[in-house]
Amino acid sequence: KGFGVEGLHMGVIAAGAALHYLKETQHNKVSHIAALTRIEEDHFVWMDQFTIRNLELVQSTGVNGVSLLNVLDQTVSPMGARMLRRWLVLPLKAQKAIQDRLNIVDYFTHHGDAADELVLEIKKMGDLERLISKVATARICPREVVQLKRALNAIVPIVEACSASENKSILKLASQLNPCDAIREKILRL
């Protein structure tokens, strides 16, 4: 209860089966899973695999073909690459969310110095999502803990740069970033 799926009997069963599978295969390292998030159908355009393939969104079917992902991908981190792929196969439907994204793109298009500064910091992060998943499953090695510290440290100047903007969408983005001060301090003490 409380995850917005109470009325979705089949969804609850599917989520339970997925958690059971993870528990069986990951040796009970699923305690980090604390929430269930539902992808709302009215927020995204839903496309089947046939449509995604025919539109060549992520992979080209031709010998010398180029997918839309290949054309657009100028990401500088694995996280950005995954996000762009997700955005292409699950495009937004809600006008406000689309406008927020466009406002961010417009801001960084007209403020190249700010964009360059963020790119440098994002490059320092590496694959923060992967590192976090390793922490959650207690499979992180010392070298990766050092990389985690670098990644979390890179969030601080990103928040500062975004907070200096007068763009509401950028300010909203800044408010969602957490440099995890307590975790960074704990890593420093190791």
Descriptions of predicted regions:
Residues 111-112:
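Short intracellular "coupling" helices and adjacent cytoplasmic loop segments at the cytosolic face
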